[in-house]
Amino acid sequence: MNIIKLKNTAIKLEEQLVIYSKIDPEAIALYSDLKPLLEKAKDGSILKSIEVGEVPGRYRFTERNLQQYGELEEAYAIFSIEVTGGETLALKLFRESMLGKS
């Protein structure tokens, strides 16, 4: 796990949460769910990856309509990838193959 990359993704996600918390109460709830994990990521105290299911809040995108905010969803996805161990080889190859098709 890349601690610096994790910290940067936590900061970017927090920035998006602050923006969308001003317009959607569901974003406030997501921020509340994620705040302890974001704080640990920003201060460098997460030393090993967590399980995918342990990242709070995914259901808020699929069931609570936060997917309408693309920048927030992308920041959440990137943070989730980093906190769960970073981009896997399979994901990297998939992304590269998709870039080659565009």
Locate predicted features.
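Phosphate-binding glycine-rich loops and adjacent basic patches that engage nucleotide phosphates
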Residues: 1-2, 35-44
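Generic structural concept
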Residues: 7-10, 14, 31-38, 55-59, ...
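Short, well-ordered alpha-helical segments
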Residues: 25-30, 46-55
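Amphipathic alpha-helical binding modules
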Residues: 54-102
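Short terminal alpha-helical segments
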Residues: 1-33, 101
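Secondary-structure edge/capping motif, primarily at the C-terminal ends of alpha-helices
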Residues: 16-21, 41-48
